[in-house]
Amino acid sequence: MPNIFVEELVHTPIEKQVIEIVERKGIGHPDSLADGMAEAMSRELSREYIRRFGAVLHHNTDETQIVAGRSNPQFGGGEVIEPIYVLLVGRATKFFNGEYIPTDKIALKAARDYIRQHMQNLDPELDVVFNVRLGEGSTDLQDVFRRKSGNVALANDTSFGIGFAPLSETERLVFNVERRIYEEFRKKNPAIGEDVKVMGLREKDRISLTIAAAFVDRYVANIKEYDAIKEELENFVKEISSEYTEREVEVFVNTADDYETGCVYLTVTGTSAENGDDGSVGRGNRCNGLITPGRPMSMEASSGKNPINHVGKIYNLLANQIAARIAEEVEGVEEVYVRILSQIGKPINEPKALSVQVIPKSGYDISKLERPARDIAEEMIANVGKITDMVIEGKVRTF
């Protein structure tokens, strides 16, 4: 493929830089909730289209918005006073081959089910008000969606996706700390809600983790118990951190707490969306699950975009997969960055440019790495349709 470019990148690898900042917004963060509901809607619409017509029809649900509610958390149990407002907005094909599709009903059920499955203390019937506003897509983009080059979809936009590999030590640490708080710590400590944000800062060989963890009021009797659980969480994070790094790790939890005034991070539902924190698709984690200001990132929201021809989703997922394979399979790669640029109306397996930038390890020459890196990129762009199947089956994350 003539549009694949492999070159050496002259740049200080992230592990050798003095400062590194990494963030992850957990499952219950308002931005992550918006991402999750948007992706759930797209996935269920795709499955229903396939069930009815044997193919995914045009849709995008990547503009979902959350407007925070109002609550009165209290030790021992408070209440939600005004429910969270969720606007499920996007485009969907509502009529096809003489048949109407209940897209609003499908989207609403998908969003409610997502909340029910991921938020233990947030009632999607009582604590959330949903408003479904799915319109039809523009005529020109629907036409691009329907047209194909053979069996290959045509790009719906001129856009780009970015990926990199391998993850740094700090990136792996931040990602896994949030994951394990959600999957492990909360099982023994239901007082910790799903809204957990982890901010990592590495200064040379010292890492500090600042964690914002929403406590659920009904499981905490008083401020003394709150403090004990917070200390237990700090110790848990310190303990598991040694599995990901030998560097010194400091852990800070809920640093805005003021015990004298009784102002602590207490919620009724486990998410800050209940009281003042809005959420939007694409404002949180990139599709690798992280926010990494020290790395190139796409501003595209991957969640909710259709998995057939929306390059804002497909190319970001693919770029990360290409980078991961190159880093794993090509000997001598210290870091690799992949950028894929589409051109609207052109086959998605024929990008305008696919750039692979490699930082070789000491003693390795780019000339020895170029061919295997190119071969991996060429193979994966030729099989870009596999991304679609993985998305519909829920086998890849988008945030």
Swiss-Prot record:
Its cofactor is Mg(2+). It is an enzyme of class 2 (transferase). Catalyzes the formation of S-adenosylmethionine from methionine and ATP. The gene is mat. It holds the Pfam family AdoMet_Synthase. GO terms for biological process: one-carbon metabolic process; S-adenosylmethionine biosynthetic process. Its EC number is 2.5.1.6. It comes from the Archaea. Belongs to the AdoMet synthase 2 family. It catalyses: L-methionine + ATP + H2O = S-adenosyl-L-methionine + phosphate + diphosphate. Keywords: ATP-binding, Magnesium, Nucleotide-binding, One-carbon metabolism, Transferase. Pathway: Amino-acid biosynthesis; S-adenosyl-L-methionine biosynthesis; S-adenosyl-L-methionine from L-methionine: step 1/1. ATP binds at residues 135-140. It comes from Archaeoglobus fulgidus (strain ATCC 49558 / DSM 4304 / JCM 9628 / NBRC 100126 / VC-16). Coiled coil: none annotated. InterPro entries: AdoMet_synthase_2_family (IPR027790), AdoMet_synthase_3 (IPR042544), S-AdoMet_synthetase_arc (IPR002795). This is S-adenosylmethionine synthase. One of its GO terms (molecular function) is ATP binding.
